[in-house]
Amino acid sequence: MSNETSNQQAQMLRGTVWLTASNFISRLLGAAYIIPWYIWMGKHGAEANGLFTMGYNIYAWFLLISTAGVPVAVAKQVAKYNTKGQEEHSFAMIRGFLKFMSLLGLIFAIIMYVLSPVFANLSGGGKDLIPVMQSLSWAVLIFPSMSVIRGFFQGHNNLKPYAISQIAEQVIRVIWMLLTAYFIMKVGSGDYVEAVTQSTFAAFIGMGASLLVLVYYLWKTGLLQHIIHRPESDSQIDTKALLWDTIREAIPFIVTGSAIQLFQIIDQMTYSNVMSWFTNYTRSELLVQFSYFSANPNKITMILIAVATSIGGVGIPLLTENYVKGDLKAAGKLVQDN
């Protein structure tokens, strides 16, 4: 076995450990917070959980259509250009993609905020669901550009910043959720809708922390100055072609990644409305039922899904590197090890 192959296997192992640990910790925190949170919501626990889940399903859908496949596609392109010795193409692509994804985040955040009343009505959540969805639109503003930076690190086979940013995001998010839920329900007004709204706004707070971690590691590794300072030779690079090439790479990931979220959206848009036609259940009772069959099981199943998908994505930059070099034997060995 060559030294290069051994080095790639070590890189893949380190990346797998970092991403698996971060995904497991993040999802576990996302499942564990519900215990004190649910208790503090008192008699409105199930309704609050239902509102939270309905808001998050729409929010996750917006994240999906605005960023699905971007981290992996960016990682693949960065690995390709670096292997060819065209690092300036990587930095040019990142500069262009950060601008493009920031604009995309702004557009989708506005759309989600403005259409929240429509989505709330279609979901059967009523007016209580509107502020919950609107609070989540702020996170949509940040996430697309943040996903580009994560993909950039993945393309350099440095998954430590990616992993730590995920953990920081979840830790800060859960802290904000629990603090605001406690103070609103136990010290303040006791308005559970306000508490849920702050709990969903925590996604924005968590992403802010995650973005700070990523920027810190960009600065620490010396990559930030290469992104900020555009060399004169950059004007000779067709940035639009680089962007389109990367977007084209992301399309398969968008298609394959949308299935689970699409099924959840269909459930959300149909359950309460259909049940209200054929039963005498109130909106609150239907919200409780939705919470039982949709909200709680997903928190557990997503732990396993996140861990499995993280393992599959780690080797993509290394596979790209071997493919560009024409070393199909090394690529096959990586697939076998993965």
Protein language model regions, located:
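Short membrane-interface helical motifs at transmembrane helix boundaries
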Residues: 107-125, 130
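N-terminal membrane topogenesis motif
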Residues: 1-32, 88, 92, 234-260
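Interfacial/gating helices of multi-pass transporter permease domains
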Residues: 38-60, 192, 196-197, 241-249, ...
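Hydrophobic alpha-helical transmembrane segments
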Residues: 165-179, 188-223
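Selective transmembrane-helix segments that form parts of the transport pathway or gating/packing helices
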Residues: 20, 94-109, 250, 338
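Specific pore-lining/lateral-gate transmembrane helices of multi-pass inner-membrane transport
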Residues: 80-97, 292-338
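Membrane-interface junctions at transmembrane-helix termini in multi-pass inner-membrane proteins
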Residues: 143-165
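Small-residue-rich midsections of specific transmembrane alpha-helices
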Residues: 53-77, 141, 294-317
